[in-house]
Amino acid sequence: MAEGKEATTSSLSQGLTPHQDPDDAPKSPPNSPNSSTRKACYGVLQSWVSKKFMTGFVVLFPVAVTFLITWWFIQFVDGFFSPIYENLGVDIFGLGFITSVLFTFFVGIFASSWLGSTVFWLGEQFIRRMPFVKHIYSASKQISTAISPDQNTTAFKEVAIIRHPRIGEYAFGFITSSVTLQTDHGEEELCSVYVPTNHLYIGDVFLVSSEEIIRPNLSIREGIEIIVSVGMTMPQVISHVDRTTNRTPHQHSLRVPLNRL
């Protein structure tokens, strides 16, 4: 019995410092109700401040981005004609921007005429003969014609939804043309559907049966906005449009025999 008491005493003495009394062993502070209340209030206040800050950030971020892009665009466009006015001694901010807008407007009027279209056609033929420059011009023109208000030159005819890449999954695309496939079982109408990836000039082309294409009630510009915004401008409800009423007469059709594929 005495040996057990000695062992217990030695074990307690080993856990203490030489000058520390056993009664003065460190004890954890009691968890008082006041400290718990303070912690709860601090957590609620921190959560409230964080949510309000994020709400303000979400509200101000698109406004700031819109303002910065608009300001940069105005300064960029204003820089085309501002040096001319500065040489004339006229220093009015925004005058170059207004001049650029009016210049673009009158160029559009001139390009719509027979003389203007002829002049621009000759200039285009000259650019297409220049190495390296012709590739840049061709890519940028395809993007501009995709959103052109002229229905005779619009590259994208309709917005399309196709089943891709697997059954049960869908992808947005644009119908660019149609083709008639001749087989032993008859003819099948196919549509050339361009499925872009960001950016808009990079993507894949699929030949899809016209009966399997879903034509939504979306304009070309709305479809471009959906793709450029990575789906953030997607409407909550998309309805189907009848193909017989939505097909444009300028959409040309090509007949491709099967033995040529």
From Swiss-Prot:
Q: Which Pfam families match?
A: DUF502 (PF04367)
**What compartments host this protein?**
Membrane
Per the UniProt topology annotation, the Extracellular ranges are 78-91
Principal subcellular localisation of the protein:
membrane
Q: Which residues lie on this side of the membrane: Cytoplasmic?
A: 1-56, 113-261
Could you name the domain of life of the organism this protein comes from? Eukaryota
How is this protein annotated for GO cellular component? Answer: endosome; Golgi apparatus; membrane; trans-Golgi network
Please, one GO biological process term? stem vascular tissue pattern formation
Q: Which family does it belong to?
A: Belongs to the plant COV1 protein family.
Q: What is this protein called?
A: Protein LIKE COV 2
Q: Which organism is it from?
A: Arabidopsis thaliana (Mouse-ear cress)
> Highest lineage ranks of the organism?
Eukaryota, Viridiplantae, Streptophyta, Embryophyta, Tracheophyta
Q: Gene symbol?
A: LCV2
